[in-house]
Swiss-Prot record:
UniProt name for this protein: SsrA-binding protein
Gene transcribed to yield this protein: smpB
Annotated GO CC locations: cytosol
Pfam families reported for this sequence: SmpB
Taxonomic lineage from the root: Bacteria, Pseudomonadati, Pseudomonadota, Gammaproteobacteria, Vibrionales
CDD domains: SmpB (cd09294)
Function text: Required for rescue of stalled ribosomes mediated by trans-translation. Binds to transfer-messenger RNA (tmRNA), required for stable association of tmRNA with ribosomes. tmRNA and SmpB together mimic tRNA shape, replacing the anticodon stem-loop with SmpB. tmRNA is encoded by the ssrA gene; the 2 termini fold to resemble tRNA(Ala) and it encodes a 'tag peptide', a short internal open reading frame. During trans-translation Ala-aminoacylated tmRNA acts like a tRNA, entering the A-site of stalled ribosomes, displacing the stalled mRNA.
Disulfide bonds: none
Length: 161
C-alpha cells in the first residue's frame, strides 16, 4: 500500500498575494507579523475573502497597523456585530522588531508594503516588505526582462521539439 503524503502543498496556506507591491517597489527585506482580528474576520479568511492589493502598513505611537486591506464579511456572519471590511488592523510584533522597522522607514524613500497574507498553523500572518519605490524606467526594465525570459523559454521549448 502506498504511503500518503501528509505534507500540505506549498501554496495552500496562502490567503492573498499583493503582486502590485513587487511591481511598484524594490523589496529590500521581508518581515512576518501577526494580526489582531475579530471572529468574523477569521471565518472570512478561512473562505479566502481577502484583498490586500491596495493595503499599506504605517507606524503610529510605536505600533504598526495595516490599512486598506479588505476582508469581505460572510453572509452568515454574526448579526450582533457590525462588520467593517476596511478597518485598520493592528499588527502583532515584538518591540525589537517594531523599533527596527521604525528606524528603517525613517530613511529616505523607504516604506512598508503588505506582500502576502497566509496561515501559519492556526494563526493568520502577514508578510511585510521594507520597500523603496521604483521609478518608471525601473518598471520598464523589469517588463523588458520578463519578456526576454518568456522569449527564451519559447525558443528553448520549440528547439526541444
Amino acid at each position: 500500500m502506498a504511503k500518503k503524503n501528509s505534507k500540505p502543498k506549498a501554496g495552500s496556506n496562502t490567503i492573498a498575494l499583493n503582486k502590485k507591491a513587487r511591481h511598484e517597489y524594490f523589496i529590500e527585506d521581508e518581515i512576518e507579523a501577526g494580526m489582531e482580528l475579530q471572529g468574523w474576520e477569521v471565518k472570512a479568511l478561512r473562505q479566502g475573502k481577502a484583498n490586500i492589493s491596495e493595503s499599506y502598513v504605517f507606524m503610529r505611537d510605536g505600533e504598526a497597523f495595516v490599512s486598506g486591506m479588505t476582508i469581505t464579511p460572510l453572509n452568515q456572519a454574526s448579526t450582533h456585530v457590525v462588520a467593517n471590511p476596511t478597518r485598520v488592523r493592528k499588527l502583532l510584533m515584538s518591540r525589537r522588531e517594531l523599533d527596527n522597522l521604525l528606524g528603517r522607514i525613517n530613511r529616505e524613500g523607504m516604506t512598508l508594503a503588505a506582500l502576502s497574507l497566509y496561515w501559519a498553523r492556526s494563526w493568520v500572518k502577514i508578510k511585510i516588505g521594507v520597500a523603496k519605490g521604483k521609478k518608471l524606467h525601473d518598471k520598464r526594465d523589469d517588463i523588458k526582462d520578463r519578456d526576454w525570459q518568456r522569449q527564451k523559454a519559447r525558443v528553448m521549448k520549440s528547439s526541444l521539439r
